Amino acid sequence: MQCADLQRVLATLPAPSEYWVAYSAGVDSHALLHLLSQCRDGVSAPLKAVHVNHGLQKDAPTWAAHAQAVCDDLGIELVTLQVSDKPAANQSIEAFARDQRYRLIGDAMPAEAMLLTGQHQDDQAETLMLQLLRGAGVDGLASMPLCREFARGWLARPLLEFSQDAVMDYAKTHQLQWIDDPSNASDAYDRNYLRLQVMPLLKKRWPHAAQTIAKSASLLGEGRHFISAQLSEQLHARVNQRCFSVESFSELDSFA
């Protein structure tokens, strides 16, 4: 995992006004932030980091202070945001934290900016497996796209082609200091259960399981894009500015 790898991925994405790295202070986002800082001269837009205090852990202020210290050391501006709401009694804490995080960051980012997150290949494999267990269709099984529209700009995941081991090797090679969220050690959460209990068993039998599962997600993403393009073409052929034919729509395959 080197600058050339990251620059190659970024070159395939829209050109933003700024790059914002979602920096939790964990190992994945720290590795991404550090890698970007090492090759910032070859990056086409200014670089910032953003840290969200969800207010869910007693040590959250310590994490924010650590994030600030790391960014100061790297010479990167850090934007710190605070979640003020609390999850409802029957609400998933994971979903609450994710929704609040993206809402706050989306509101804070300027137009045409790109949020970069640290999800990697193993995260993609876990996402596909979760979607399978939920009975998802093509949209869900395509899992996490490399880039999508977000707020007034984009959200991209430039580490999706790299394994968890590659990210960890980078962090150890560069002697990065990160914070382990204690909630990641609990298999009470579905994703953690897959990560801690299921994936190790799969990798014991099939060492490249995460890579091949993530590849399936990528292929499903291509299929989703093709279906979307075909559906758009069919809609344009059947709708004009004033009306559309119900009969022509009834001729479409039910999958469309």
Show where each model-derived region lies.
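Core alpha/beta nucleotide-donor-binding catalytic domains of modification enzymes
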Residues: 1-196, 200
